[in-house]
Amino acid sequence: MTQYVGLDVSQKETAVCVVDQSGKILFEGKAPSDPGALARLIHKRAPDAERIGFETGAMASWLWHELKRIGLPVVCVDARHAHAALSVRMNKSDPNDARGLAELIRVGWYREVRVKSDDSQAIRSLLVARARLVSIRRDLENQVRSLLKEVGLLFPRAIRGPFRTKVQQLLDDDHVLRPIVAGLLAVHEQVEREQAAFDQRVRAQAKADETTRRLMSVPGVGVVTALAFRHTIDDPTRFRSAQTVGAYLGLTPRRKQSGEQDYNGRISKWGDRLLRTYLFEAASVLLHRTQRWSALKAWGTRLMKRVGAKKAKVAVARKIAVILHCIWTDGTSFDWGAPQAA
């Protein structure tokens, strides 16, 4: 007899529900959120399980890989789709969610999410940690600027040379702020040191990967953006066409159509926020800093004059994502093109 299993995963315990082909509940219970414990329970209560489903979440990637290694037919369900189905239930509880997931898995009304490989997940963790250090360093610098401004010491936004050296030059040895700022600068120094170590690891990863090096041939795309794209997409063949990458990364506008109304709104901002941010930065660098002519830059410049800088950057970021996917799948590098004669 074929069974379908729904797992509602939480940090300590996982609610489990097993149903048969007709939707009849065969078992409901809980088990520790441990792959071994869950596998033993499933083998006992659902030995002929055809599919085992759970939602995307913080533990989903780890649990999916571990249960796959054990040989279980697990699927990871898009949490947004699952929420839309589960929210119609009157009572919200872990057993009810597990029951709803089991029913979704049985009837097939779900969208399966592709789980990143272990290698891509590790690189993703490295990039997230680096981004956090960059954010902390920026927050520390802004806090120091704010403290200096309160006593009339204006610190320029753009500086040359080490930040800590410039701050120390502004403060006299006996200034009341010097011991206060010193603590922040000490933390800033440590954060900067750790960020440099992460940067070195990022460069080493990019240098060792031929695909990442080719992605870096696109103007505006540096080491971090190329590596983030490489390990966020993970497998380019899962996209039917390069055009769908923009939608996957939340760079396409939402559409609302009902009756006589039909209009496009702002971009959806679904997908990976970190990579989307890096693509925006790449678009900005291409439009404002890259000196060499390219067909992409010329197109973006014309678009910027017509719709404004903000919308143009979104369009260029989306175009860069499409180009990166094409470069990856075709095994080519960026084609700068040739200026057309007037």
Where in the sequence are the language-model features?
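A detector of single, family-specific signature residues
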Residues: 1-342
